Amino acid sequence: MKRVFNLIVVDESGSMCVIEKQALAGLNETIQTVKKVQDAHPDMEQHITIMTFDSGHKRYIYDNVLAKDATMLSKKDYNPGGATPLYDAVGIAISRLNAITTDDDHVLVTIITDGEENCSTEYSLNMIKTLIEKLKKHNWTFSFIGTDNLDVESMAKEMNIDNHLTFTEDAEGTAEMFATERVCRMSFMHNIFAGHAIGKGSYFNSDNNDDKKH
């Protein structure tokens, strides 16, 4: 049986409070999308990991749970505050998942942030880019999603991430971003099921989005 691991690393720093409600709704919609994929392709086992992070914590809301066992999140699960240890969160999350996956598995990593790295102590940029470049050779696909106050393309490139998406940090922009991501995730999953190769930098390439700003 094919196994697909969905890892979502979400910024929970203080500035995300502007879109707190929409971010929570978007995460729930993403969970629903993965569950729908599981229902559509029962012989392709879907796993979900969601980590949120700020300067006070790197917390797993879900830690490698089967999609069928995942339930919707509530307000208590997402409460923005603190600074942005982006490299630590990404490094910890992908290293932990790497320890339990094999080369036969597919891993889709989604990183969502509205701020730049500012307080990591365990992982440096060089460590992250080296780790990501290594994992990309073993059926790992990475996407980096950031707000329009950031140079999202440059941040993604610095980490060796080929897929990037910029969105406006307001209710409408956040909702549109998650809608785009869901379409792309569904397409990605169908391609895996069909045995199609996943092209470099192709995750967000669809009629719905070509790395457009929302």
Regions found by a protein language model. Name each.
Residues 1-214:
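Acidic, low-complexity intrinsically disordered regions
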